[in-house]
Swiss-Prot record:
UniProt-recorded name of the protein: Phenylalanine--tRNA ligase alpha subunit
Assembly: Tetramer of two alpha and two beta subunits.
Keyword Protein biosynthesis: yes
Named cofactor requirement(s): Mg(2+)
Gene Ontology terms, MF aspect: ATP binding; magnesium ion binding; phenylalanine-tRNA ligase activity; tRNA binding
Primary location class: cytoplasm
Catalytic function, reaction form: tRNA(Phe) + L-phenylalanine + ATP = L-phenylalanyl-tRNA(Phe) + AMP + diphosphate + H(+)
Short name of one Pfam family: tRNA-synt_2d
Family: Belongs to the class-II aminoacyl-tRNA synthetase family. Phe-tRNA synthetase alpha subunit type 1 subfamily.
Organism: Aeromonas salmonicida (strain A449)
Enzyme class of the recorded protein, top EC level: ligase
Gene3D superfamilies for the chain: Bira Bifunctional Protein, Domain 2
Length: 327
């Protein structure tokens, strides 16, 4: 009995002094293995009488259990210690739950362009695109804006040289389409345009969508009907709309289109008019046979009105707090 107590004490001391699981397993084999101390002790029970064996066996098992409990406790402590050291050494805790991958969303300007393309597509308009670096003929001359015309000074144009520039509108796409396609023509031209201006309602780069219809019997009445349908479908409201006389070099007559805001004030949303005969002549279309109408709108302005944004510059600052609202 005294010998067992000494062995248990010795085993516990060895167990407490172990600093790794492998050494701890060696101690387990030494005391509890098939050839370990307690296995050998159980073999000595055969030399005892039948009356003595139960009591002696119980003492051996009790001592064996004490060693087993000490082994289990030390193993748990070593495993926890090893895990803590590993976590402290790792820059990434691979046991942490994964981070959810957020789905991206379309930029509000992109959403507006797609919406405009879809609405006009339902009315039979095709999408045409053209170069953003434009020459003087397609950006000005063919649009009834000759070199001496005062309207050229109205555009704060970015020039590369006297006849090459960043386009100030997508009207050049209309000219290129009419150069290569005979009427009937029914297109819209979305894209980036550039003007040297920057404030709450202007940026050096912005987006426009311009539309063109050329046919034998195109009329201002048809133009009004198309724009009425577009605006009411775009804003999803039965808006009050007015056409206000205006001036553009490339259309005659010309008008600007306003919608009544919720505050009772008129808001300008786009410009339009009948294509000027000089524009048709510049691309080889007979204005005696064909007529046409054109319209143009700023995408950012329509986006601001639809979503209630006050500062145009917010669309280009890449602030996720702002952009996530449109997902």
């Amino acid at each position: 009995m005294q010998q067992l107590e000494e062995v248990v004490g010795q085993a516990k001391a060895e167990i407490e002094g172990v600093n790794d699981v492998a050494t701890l397993d060696e101690i387990r084999v030494k005391y509890l293995g098939k050839k370990g101390f307690f296995t050998e002790q159980m073999k000595t029970l055969g030399a005892l009488s039948a009356e003595e064996r139960p009591a002696a066996g119980a003492v051996i098992n009790q001592a064996k259990q004490q060693v087993q409990d000490a082994l289990n406790a030390r193993r748990d402590a070593l495993v926890e210690q090893e895990l803590n050291q590993k976590l402290a050494a790792e820059t990434i805790d691979v046991s942490l739950p994964g981070r959810r991958i957020e789905n991206g969303g379309l930029h509000p300007v992109t959403r507006t362009i797609e919406r405009i393309e879809r609405l006009f597509g339902e009315m039979g308009f095709k999408v045409e695109r053209g170069p953003e670096i434009e020459d003087g003929f397609h950006n000005f001359d063919a649009l009834n804006i000759p070199a001496h015309h005062p309207a050229r000074t109205d555009h704060d144009t970015f020039y590369f040289n006297p006849d090459l520039m960043l386009r100030t509108h997508t009207s050049g796409v209309q000219i290129r389409t009419m150069e290569h396609q005979q009427p009937p023509i029914r297109i819209i031209a979305p894209g980036r345009v550039y003007r040297n201006d920057y404030d709450m309602t202007h940026t050096p780069m912005f987006h426009q969508v311009e539309g063109l219809l050329v046919d034998e019997h195109a009329s201002f009445t048809e133009l009004k009907g198309i724009l009425h349908d577009f605006l009411r479908n775009y804003f999803e409201e039965d808006l009050t709309i007015r056409f206000r006389p205006s001036y553009f070099p490339f259309t005659e007559p010309s008008a600007e289109v306003d919608v009544m805001g919720k505050n009772g004030k008129w808001l300008e949303v786009l410009g339009c008019g009948m294509v000027h005969p000089n524009v048709l002549r510049s691309v080889g279309i007979d204005p005696e046979k064909y007529s046409g109408f054109a319209f143009g709108m700023g995408v950012e302005r329509l986006t601001m009105l639809r979503y209630g944004v006050n500062d145009l510059r917010a669309f280009f600052e890449n602030d996720l707090r702002f952009l996530k609202q449109f997902k």
